[in-house]
């Protein structure tokens, strides 16, 4: 009985921590975090249990993309009449484009943000080439971070006509470590 009570208290404490983090996110971006979490403390414990061993910083772009698309379900199966460019084609196009940290990138029909993410990843890879010791050297880390983060913040833009998919793109950008502030909901053809 005391074990059950201890578990309930742990679940409740975890629930409160998750809710506080969510509210913190909501203060930063009300559009992305506008829905309330409707999970019980037990279900949150289960989700956290699955995710706690996952390090998104060390997970490659394709794996994160597949996981995100699976998690988001019907958005990415064309149930809303949109067509999502296959990851291999997105990667090919971004690879052949001369995207640098000072390039401006605009995707007028950004969908889930695939082109934006691959462009960001390309610039981040270039930063890693320029600052190979960024993980150990604080000065290099600051330069490495500034190199790709400035690109994400100032040069990377997405427009998506569907408000729900625009929010999904922002979430996808957050999962991939920033750049979500320049994704807007609008008609990219007329804007």
Explain the meaning of each model-derived region.
Residues 1-74:
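Long recognition/docking surfaces used for binding and targeting
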Residues 77-78:
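A glycine-/small-polar-enriched, mobile loop at the entrance of the PLP active site in fold-type I
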Residues 82-191:
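Conserved S-adenosyl-L-methionine
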């Amino acid at each position: 009985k005391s074990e059950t009570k201890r578990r309930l208290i742990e679940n409740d404490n975890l629930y409160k921590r998750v809710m506080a983090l969510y509210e913190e996110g909501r203060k930063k971006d009300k559009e992305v975090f506008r829905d309330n979490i409707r999970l019980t403390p037990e279900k949150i414990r289960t989700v956290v249990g699955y995710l706690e061993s996952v390090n998104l910083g060390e997970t490659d772009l394709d794996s994160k993309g597949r996981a995100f698309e699976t998690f988001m379900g019907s958005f990415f199966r064309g149930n809303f009449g949109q067509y999502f460019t296959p990851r291999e084609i997105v990667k090919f196009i971004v690879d052949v484009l001369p995207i640098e940290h000072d390039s401006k990138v605009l995707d007028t029909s950004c969908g889930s943000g695939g082109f934006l993410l691959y462009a960001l990843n390309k610039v981040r890879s270039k930063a890693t080439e320029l600052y190979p010791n960024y993980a150990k050297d604080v000065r290099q880390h600051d330069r490495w971070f500034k190199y790709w983060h400035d690109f994400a913040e100032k040069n990377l833009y997405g427009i998506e006509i569907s408000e729900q998919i625009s929010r999904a793109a922002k979430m996808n950008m957050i999962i991939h470590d920033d750049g979500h502030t320049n994704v807007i909901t609008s008609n990219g053809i007329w804007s």
